[in-house]
Structure formats: structure tokens, C-alpha cells
């Protein structure tokens, strides 16, 4: 043992017995500390398992570096960062897989809902300071349609795993069918315990419908847009404790699957969470493919921020081609919200109130990325309350903060370019025409015309060179100017490179489809199993079905006299591989 005194060094010799004693004491101290750590982790594991046994899901806080979160996000359902710890939800399987990582964690008690005041009738929802029971929720959606049949239509997206209804209210001035209307989709509570948005969207339905006659901004909005509103995307999670209460609401669905990790992912493919598609996921995917939304917002709780794409990439890895557009509409929304809210609202994630999804934290399988990447629908995720299920008496405050912003978000995001694409000779509308903004790298995220020939492309103000393209047609180039806060409408006529309809009727293979003109029956012979639909000149599907190999007789007595198009599809039913024209002509 050495010790210095000034310029002298003194040497002390400790007895060997004392050195051994010190060594043993040090080892003992380490063992004691390790035992405390093990005991602590065992206690946390016991708490987590108790939550899992009671609720089927548990919340944990995990100590992990940013580098470890890539692996972590594929095993658990990350829900944000608290200091230097990551908040995550786990089910039984996820927790077992997580334990193999050997990371430190602790159990987080589930957020207590201080006051779950439930409405047992529609009249009890008049003050908007209660949560509806499941039956009242369904009754409210039906009541909107019954009271305002000219302004809304109630649609069923599908059924949950437990058979509860996934409802959507289509709100628009349906008497005005002359203009092309962009389709906007609001949905909430894909995580069943995030219920601020559920009540807020119910109130949005009520406000739009009751204000239509008296508010010119609302009437103008509904005359030019179709707004789809699904207040509750995960009813099994919201009413996990039974249809009469949301007191035991949980994040996951009935199978303890996070629905916002269950969609196809741009990086990890069809099943990023290693789970089968849930009934809710399939329903929303099919509904989105059918309706072909232009803009969408998925409302969550647990934070207060506008989250724009991507979720699976950080901004340094890949940016959405419409990043500037996303930032513009999000900034407008934040400005509207801060006009009516406390100064610290929408500041818990970033002071601006806006974040890139992956820069906040990376996840895979989100609906936002699915809509943007696979369906070309511009969607953001909107987190509206740090408390996932606030006490019911606070719910009116959130409408005060958000009401104007939610209405204006629809208006602002549906500005740009819209119109109809038609065949220049027959004037038949054209489906699946690609609309490409030239001189801009759109990263293959082009929009396409719909079955009725209509299209919408969200754009900031400016002048754009636009190309319309479709197999069998010459490319069409036009110059479009979009004014500030305006929408430019263009009818685009495209010239076919195929033979004309008249020529096609003269040279058509009579052994394939006959007679032509037809009376009450049409015969078609095909070489492989196919699916078909029949559309009119507006692109409206009037009839559809399946065709077997060989001769098929199709009854067309329901069709009026006129010219129709039959489209044949393969088993994927995605794009027609053959199009034929026939005439329905009943002679008297």
C-alpha cells in the first residue's frame, strides 16, 4: 500500500489476512447488490404478470438505448418515451419474448379513470360530459341518419372479433351531385383505451349536421366534400369490461393484438407483428380499398401532437414526397387549436406540436403507413390528449380546443386539384388513371382516378405540370394553377390508342360475347375462371359476379336500354384484364 507525503513515498504493508478479508467483503457486497437487483426484477415481473392475468395486457417502462429500440419495437408495442425510459404495452407472448432481451424494466400501473360517468340514453349525452355505453353509441349513430337523411348515411365497415359493429357515418350534402367531392376519413380509438377522440368525433358529427342550415362554412364544406367519420375503431377494447362501461377499456382488441401494428408495412411486409390480420384490420383495409379515401386522420390519445409520415422510417432515412404539404396543414391545425386552448396544449412531444412519426419513435404496421404507402391516401396520426381516457367532466374542454381545428382540417386538406377523366370519343369515365406531378419526385406515391372517373390530388398553391396516363391511352399533359386556399377542377379527355368503340362492336369476336345488342340475357364464353362487373357511362357498377370456364348466361333484365362496359378480372379482382362493350336493347 503506497501513500505519498510531500516528496516522500511511504510504503505500508497490509497483512495478507486483511487483504483477503477486504476481497471477501467486496465480493459479498457485489453479491448482495446482485441479489437486490434480481429481487427487484422478480418483483416487477410478478407485478407485470398480475396485470397480464387480470387485463390481458400490461404496461412497462424499459431502459433501452436508441440503438436497441429497433429490436424492441418489433417485440412490444411502444407508446412513447418518458425521460430515458420507453413506455410499452405487452401481452403474454410479447412479455415472454421481451424477457429474452435482458433489459431492465419496471411495471407501470394502468392509468386510472377517475370518473367514468356513463350515458345510458341519447338524452344523457346532450351535455357531452359522459361516455356512451355501447348501445347508446350505436343508437347515436343511427339517430344521426334518422334525423338528417339528406346529409348522412350510416355504413357498417365490418364487425369486431367479438361481433361488435364498426360504424362509419358518411356526412355530405348528397343533394349536390354535380361536383367532384374529395373523400376525407376521420377515425378514432383504434386503441380501445384512447377514448377522447371517440366522444369528440361524435360531437363533430352532431355539429356538422345541426350547423348545416345556419353556418355557411359548414354548408360549403359539405357541398364540396364527403366526410367519413368512424368514432370507434376498436369497440372490443373500449368495452372490454362490458357494454355498459369503459372503466376497464384496454389498448388491445379481444385477441390482445395491437390493431395499429397489424397492418401491412412498407419494410416488414404483410404481417409485421407476426400476427394474423384481425377482423377489425381486415374490415378497415377492405373499406378503405372500396371507398378509396383521399385524406385521412387517425385520432389517438396519450400525447398531444400531429404525427405525419413515416412511422417506419426516420426523416433522415426517407421523407414523404408531400412533407411540405403535411407540415402546412398541420401548422394550420395547430394555429386553430391554440386559439382556444391553454398555452401548453400540444407541446408535450414538441413545442411546434408537430413531429415526424419515425423521429418520435419508429413503429411498424401502423394504419398511417399502410394508407400512405399502399393506398396513396394522405393520412396523419393525431394525438389529442395526454390522458387516454380523461374523466368524463373534462370531455367538453377538448371539443372547445379542437372543434374549429377539426372542421378546418378537412377544408384545408381537400384543397388542390380535382376533376374527372373521360375517354375523348365515348365520354366514358376512366378508372385507375395515374395522375403524376411532373418535375417532382413523388416516390411512386401517385394518386389514381376512381371508378367514377373522379380524382383528387392535394396540392399547395402554385403552378404544376401534370401528366395523366393509362394503358391503352395516350398520355395527357396539362398545366394546372392552384390558388391559395383554392381548388382547381379539370375535366381531362384522354385519347385511346386502341380501336374505337364503334370498331370494336363491328369486329368483336362473336364467340366470346353475344348477342350484341342483347335483350334480357347475355352469353359470354371464357377460357379461365374470372370475375366480372358491368358499369355504365358514369363508371357506376350495376352488376357483378363470377364466371366459370366455358359458356355463361348472364341475366341483364335490370339494365335500361343503352351502352355498357363489362370488365373481366382475374382471381385477385384488382385490375381488369379485359374490357368489352355491349348494348342492351329491348325492342317492343
Question: What does each model-found stretch correspond to?
Answer:
Residues 429, 437-460:
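Short, acidic Ser/Thr/Gly-rich low-complexity loop/linker segments typical of extracellular
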Residues 178-328, 335, 339, 343, ...:
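Active-site/substrate-binding loop(s) of hydrolase catalytic cores
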Residues 1-5, 14-15, 504-514, 518-588:
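C-terminal outer-membrane/trafficking sorting elements
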Residues 417-424, 453, 492:
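A short, amphipathic beta-strand motif
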Residues 471-496, 581-588:
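Structured interaction patches on ligand/partner-binding surfaces of diverse proteins
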Residues 2-3, 9-52:
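Bacterial Sec-dependent N-terminal signal peptides
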Residues 296-320, 352-411:
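Active-site-adjacent mobile loop/cap segments within catalytic or ligand-binding domains
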Residues 453, 462-472:
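A short, solvent-exposed beta-strand micro-motif common in secreted/extracellular proteins
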Amino acid at each position: 500500500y503506497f501513500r505519498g507525503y510531500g516528496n516522500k513515498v511511504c510504503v505500508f504493508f497490509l497483512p495478507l489476512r486483511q487483504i483477503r478479508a477486504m476481497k471477501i467483503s467486496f465480493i459479498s457486497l457485489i453479491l448482495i447488490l446482485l441479489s437486490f437487483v434480481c429481487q427487484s426484477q422478480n418483483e416487477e415481473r410478478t407485478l407485470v404478470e398480475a396485470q397480464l392475468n387480470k387485463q390481458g395486457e400490461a404496461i412497462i417502462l424499459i431502459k433501452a438505448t436508441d440503438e436497441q429500440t429497433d429490436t424492441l419495437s418489433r417485440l412490444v408495442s411502444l407508446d412513447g418515451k418518458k425521460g430515458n425510459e420507453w413506455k410499452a404495452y405487452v401481452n403474454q407472448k410479447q412479455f415472454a419474448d421481451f424477457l429474452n432481451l435482458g433489459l431492465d424494466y419496471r411495471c407501470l400501473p394502468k392509468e386510472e379513470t377517475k370518473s367514468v360517468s356513463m350515458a345510458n340514453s341519447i338524452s344523457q349525452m346532450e351535455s357531452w360530459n359522459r361516455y356512451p355505453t355501447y348501445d347508446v353509441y350505436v343508437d347515436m349513430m343511427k339517430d344521426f341518419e334518422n334525423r338528417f337523411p339528406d346529409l348522412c348515411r350510416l355504413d357498417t365497415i365490418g364487425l369486431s372479433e367479438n361481433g361488435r359493429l364498426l360504424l362509419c357515418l358518411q356526412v355530405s350534402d348528397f343533394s349536390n351531385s354535380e361536383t367532384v367531392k374529395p373523400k376525407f376519413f376521420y377515425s378514432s380509438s383504434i386503441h380501445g383505451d384512447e377514448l377522447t377522440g371517440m366522444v369528440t368525433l361524435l360531437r363533430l358529427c352532431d355539429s356538422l349536421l345541426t350547423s348545416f342550415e345556419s353556418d355557411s362554412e359548414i354548408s360549403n364544406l359539405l357541398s364540396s366534400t364527403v366526410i367519413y367519420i368512424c368514432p370507434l375503431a376498436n369497440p372490443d377494447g373500449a368495452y372490454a369490461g362490458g357494454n355498459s362501461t369503459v372503466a376497464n377499456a384496454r389498448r388491445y382488441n379481444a385477441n390482445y393484438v395491437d390493431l395499429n401494428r397489424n397492418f401491412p408495412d412498407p419494410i416488414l411486409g404483410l404481417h409485421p407483428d407476426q400476427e394474423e390480420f384481425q377482423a377489425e384490420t381486415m374490415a378497415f383495409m377492405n373499406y378503405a380499398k372500396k371507398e378509396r379515401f383521399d385524406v385521412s386522420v387517425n385520432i389517438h390519445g396519450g400525447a398531444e401532437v400531429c404525427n405525419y409520415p413515416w412511422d417506419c422510417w426516420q426523416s433522415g432515412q426517407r421523407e414523404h414526397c408531400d412533407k411540405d404539404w403535411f407540415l402546412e396543414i398541420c401548422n394550420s391545425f395547430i394555429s386553430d387549436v391554440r386559439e382556444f386552448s391553454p398555452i401548453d396544449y400540444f407541446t408535450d412531444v414538441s413545442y411546434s406540436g408537430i413531429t415526424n412519426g419515425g423521429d418520435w419513435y419508429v413503429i411498424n404496421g401502423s394504419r398511417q403507413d399502410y394508407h400512405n404507402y399502399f393506398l396513396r391516401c394522405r393520412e396523419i396520426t393525431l394525438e389529442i390528449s395526454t390522458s387516454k381516457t380523461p374523466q368524463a367532466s373534462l370531455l367538453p374542454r377538448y371539443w372547445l380546443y379542437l372543434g374549429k381545428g377539426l372542421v378546418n382540417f378537412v377544408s384545408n386538406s381537400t384543397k388542390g386539384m380535382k376533376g374527372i377523366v373521360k375517354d375523348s370519343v365515348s365520354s366514358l369515365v376512366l378508372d385507375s388513371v395515374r395522375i403524376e406531378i411532373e418535375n417532382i419526385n413523388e416516390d411512386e406515391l401517385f394518386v389514381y382516378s376512381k371508378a367514377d372517373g373522379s380524382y383528387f390530388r392535394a396540392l399547395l398553391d402554385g403552378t404544376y405540370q401534370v401528366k395523366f396516363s393509362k394503358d391503352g391511352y395516350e398520355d395527357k399533359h396539362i398545366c394546372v394553377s392552384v390558388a391559395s386556399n383554392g381548388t382547381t377542377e379539370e375535366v381531362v379527355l384522354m385519347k385511346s390508342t386502341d380501336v374505337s368503340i364503334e370498331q370494336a362492336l363491328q369486329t368483336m369476336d362473336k364467340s366470346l360475347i353475344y348477342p350484341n345488342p342483347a335483350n334480357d340475357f347475355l352469353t359470354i364464353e371464357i377460357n379461365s375462371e374470372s370475375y366480372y362487373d358491368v358499369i355504365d357511362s358514369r363508371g357506376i357498377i350495376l352488376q357483378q359476379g363470377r364466371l366459370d370456364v366455358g359458356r355463361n348466361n348472364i341475366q341483364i333484365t335490370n339494365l335500361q336500354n343503352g351502352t355498357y362496359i363489362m370488365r373481366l378480372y382475374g382471381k385477385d379482382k384488382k385490375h381488369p384484364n379485359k374490357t368489352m362493350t355491349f348494348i342492351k336493347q329491348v325492342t317492343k
